[in-house]
A protein has these predicted regions:
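Transmembrane catalytic cores of multi-pass membrane glycosyltransferases
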Residues: 25-72, 172-173, 187, 192-349, ...
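Membrane-interface micro-motifs in multi-pass membrane enzymes
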Residues: 56, 104-142, 325-349, 373-402
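Signature aromatic-anchored transmembrane alpha helix within multi-pass, membrane-resident enzymes
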Residues: 287-292, 340-367, 371, 410-425
Length: 425
């Protein structure tokens, strides 16, 4: 207790997060789902044999090591979890640092330690760790976009981190867009960046390498997954895959009684409370309350007997069946229109809560990145089989937006503060 009191107030949430996570990790079960499979394979195979046919060499190497020595993971993962919290805090500015850090430390536990449907080791090493590495790589880019420069040791640290981050396909695409976009932006400002350019090239090369390993050749990973999870996947057009990514994402967020809908409900309730506290206009309040009300209604409807809600299958287009069987594709216009309405309401609420065009644009781009990270699963036959862990990045963007809103609306604080710039320098 004395040690905690000796730490500065704004840093105490990180200290408590690390200590609590370390204690909990000592007792986590590691013998279920993919963790059990990998533990068996790692005990029987050499590393070279384990990596045979792998498209994620670095993450699978770490999976192999931790499957053989799980105590190492129990010691290291709390450290990575804390690094993620510190990195998010570094990227986002807020006058009330203690509140910001507390919200971050509590919020990251959900995607990092609850959405672990592949097992704790497999999910964290393949999702939590790449996201953490990717966000660390964005700190120098943020600094350069704000007029700073990148020191030599940032190259030494961030290039290896990038190689690990791009082992996760979703993070590879997101980082490619961000680094290419950042490099082009700096060029337009007549400040071309060696760091952004180098990282953009590495991301593009990794993107091609990932595509080659996953999709090229007989017996590729893509072919195996199509046969196992989505036999009709090759019949889908590009438009079908985009629509599948969109509808599957919002089905899980608003209609499926599981982890993703809980996170979306909390986020939209936060938006609704903020809107109600900021404005008394009935139109704003109706817009804000629609997404959480929609989610509660359809999640509860999905738990009722089919005879009690005969309209549900018509609205969902049969999506409720895909989670437990080989997937097929169906297009339901009403379902997509409802999802679009939810999107518009969320954007309107955020737009109303953010002050200034730049702040709104930043929030919208952040949400778009999160949505895009999940929508790209429409281009994978494991769009359903991958489970809720593919929402990891999207749920973190909810957290990013929540911190932005807290910063832009001092009246939500216990102690009123003047808002500062959205992203820290």
């Amino acid at each position: 207790m004395h040690l905690i009191k000796s730490v500065k107030t704004e840093y105490r949430p990180f200290f408590i997060l690390f200590a609590g996570a370390l204690l909990v990790h000592l007792f986590l079960p590691l013998s279920w789902s993919d963790d059990a499979v990998f533990a068996k394979e790692a005990s029987e195979l050499t590393l070279a044999a384990f990596l045979n046919g792998s498209s994620r060499l670095l993450t699978d190497t770490m999976t192999y090591v931790f499957a053989r020595h799980p105590f190492l993971w129990r010691m290291l993962n709390p450290f990575v979890l804390t690094i993620l919290a510190v990195t998010i805090s570094r990227l986002l500015a807020c006058k009330n640092e203690t509140l910001k850090n507390t919200v971050i430390c509590i919020s990251i536990l959900y995607p990092a330690m609850v959405l672990v449907d592949a097992g704790f080791i497999a999910t964290t090493v393949n999702y939590l760790w790449p996201v953490t590495c990717g966000l660390l790589c964005l700190i120098p880019l943020q600094r350069e976009c704000r007029g700073g420069y990148t020191k030599w040791y940032a190259y030494v640290c961030c290039i290896p981190l990038l190689f690990y981050a791009v082992n996760m396909e979703q993070m590879c695409v997101i980082l490619t867009v961000l680094f290419v976009g950042g490099f082009l932006y700096l060029c337009t400002q007549k400040k071309p960046s060696l760091y952004a350019g180098l990282q953009a090239l590495l991301c593009l090369a990794s993107l091609y390498y990932t595509y080659y390993l996953n999709c090229v050749g007989d017996g590729s990973r893509m072919e195996r997954e199509i046969s196992r999870y989505f036999p009709s996947f090759l019949q889908l057009s590009v438009w079908n895959k985009v629509e599948l990514g969109f509808s599957s994402t919002f089905y899980c967020l608003t209609m499926d009684a599981a982890y993703a809908s809980v996170a979306f409900l909390v986020f939209t309730l936060f938006l609704a409370v903020a809107v109600f506290r900021k404005s008394s206009k009935i139109s704003f309040r109706i817009t804000a309350i629609f997404p959480p009300a929609f989610t509660v209604f359809f999640v509860i409807s999905g738990l009722l007997p089919a005879k009690a809600v005969p309209f549900l299958s018509y609205v969902t287009g049969g999506m409720h069946q895909y989670l437990v069987a080989k997937a097929t594709y169906s297009f339901a216009p009403l379902r997509d229109l409802l999802f679009i309405a939810v999107c518009i309401c969320v954007l309107c609420s955020i737009g109303m809560l953010m002050c200034g065009k730049q702040a709104r644009l930043t929030a919208f781009v952040t949400l778009a990145a999160g949505l895009g990270s999940r929508m790209m699963m429409g281009f994978s036959p494991t769009v359903w089989a991958s489970g809720y862990r593919t929402f990891h990045i999207m749920l973190l963007t909810f957290l990013f937006c929540a911190i932005m809103i807290l910063n832009q609306n001092p009246q939500l604080f216990i102690r009123k503060e003047k808002p500062v710039e959205i992203f820290s320098t």
